[in-house]
Amino acid sequence: MLSSIKSAAKGTVIYGFANVSIKLIGIILIPIYTNYTYLSKEDFGVLGVMDITYQLTIIVFGLSLYQSLARWYLDPEHKSSQKSMHFTVVIINMAICAVSFLFVYLFSPQISELLFSSDKFSRLIWIMFASSSVNIVSSVSMMLLRLQEKAIKYAVISITKLIVTLGVTILFVVFWHRNVQGVYEAMLIGEIAGLILISADIFRNSILKFEYKKLLQMLNYGLPLMLASVSSVLLNTFDRYSLNYLSDLDTVGTYTLAFRIANTIKVVVISSIQLSLIPIIFRKMGDPDHKRFIAKSMNYSALLVMLVILFLSLFSLEIVKVFASNVSYWEAASIIPLLSFSMIFIMMKENVLIGLQITKNSFIMGLLIAFTALFNLGLNMLLIPRYLLYGAAASTLISQMVMFILFYFISQRKYVIPYELKNLLLLIIAGIGLYCLSLVSGHWPLLPRLLFKLLLIVLLPMLLIPLKFYEPIELQRIKEFIVKYKKMIFK
């Protein structure tokens, strides 16, 4: 058990580093995006809408085939056809993206009119789609690197994409003043660089054989996953689409800043945990302790995520001031805690999904997420006209909570896993309590306020000891870890 957790932790660090490298672009460039010299607040709102459309495009036109490939690739029954399955998925993705790009290119003015009530973003639309198409093709082989546990190579390619994309973005936006279009031109160049780097693995892991029957099986498994993924993306993006239609692009710009900061929890921490854990969980399916491993991984993943949630929530104003010098953006700090706390339910939902993935109940997953997405849309329609930013953030938090509850009960009916719900509830209550306690320091001088907030974050793991969050053996291992590294530091 402990060796599996250590293996997952090691993978989390490496994949986390790779994920950080990719997502750092969105964080590093915030001071540029929020500087009126380069992008207006309306431009940043356009970027926010384009970002979520980019995510949706990848999900829809990728058909979740890379996820299906992962499920079939690890199955011993299909070991002899791994390369032909990989070839099949790559070819199908390339064909779909090529045909779809032609359609988007021809109808980009109409798509721009639909999104922004103007056709002036038509060029931006097809550049964005070209970038997402390259991402769809390369993501299949990037998934293969994960399945083959080539974490270092995965990280190297990801970091190279970061450097290329970051450098070209700065060149296009800061020096050539190409506005939002320059952002996606740079993204396209970065994706092409990543595809070139992974191309050797594409050829190495392919043989010229089209697996028609297996493709149908993967589509049968993957299409419900695509529905789930589309619904999930809509669930996470209806807030900005709704703000775009019910408010204005300036409001979308403020919300986008808050969401980008809060969403670092998902794209860096939660995604890294999932990238590392999922292959280990599927390999351990035959082990007698695999259910306990899943439950324990939930506990410690939740603790890690809650620590980051507290950091972003307690220091939201300071973080916003660092990234955005324009005072008009500072209101974003007030909704970061709501968006951040929604991430704990996203993380737990991803974990309980495992039961449905193991039993291949992808259709149920799609239905549940679709229902929650519609519920979220209804909440947005109800709350945004009256509460604007706060309504959108509250809608996100409530919807993620509802989705976790639905997935937990349905998943447990299909595949029972002994999750420690009491410990998870105590963790969430402790996190909320510490955040509320931090509010008393709102008018303190800067240094005492910062120190007090840091103390509250450090207190969280210790507060869980009397609440019996840890088992005795876990406390013993923690003590041994502290003693070991204390000796190394003071040697």
Locate predicted features.
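Hydrophobic alpha-helical transmembrane segments
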Residues: 122, 126, 155-203, 221, ...
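Signature of the first transmembrane helix
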Residues: 4-67, 92-105, 162-166, 170, ...
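Helix-loop junctions and terminal segments of transmembrane helices
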Residues: 61-78, 147, 258, 262-302, ...
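Membrane-proximal transmembrane or re-entrant/amphipathic helices at the cytosolic face
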Residues: 440-491
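N-terminal membrane topogenesis motif
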Residues: 1-28, 80-88, 212-228, 472-491
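Interhelical loop/hinge segments that connect adjacent transmembrane helices in multipass membrane
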Residues: 1-8, 180-182, 186, 196-236, ...
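Interfacial segments at transmembrane-helix termini and the short loops linking adjacent helices
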Residues: 108-128, 312-344
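Membrane-interface junctions at transmembrane-helix termini in multi-pass inner-membrane proteins
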Residues: 134-157, 202, 206, 337-371
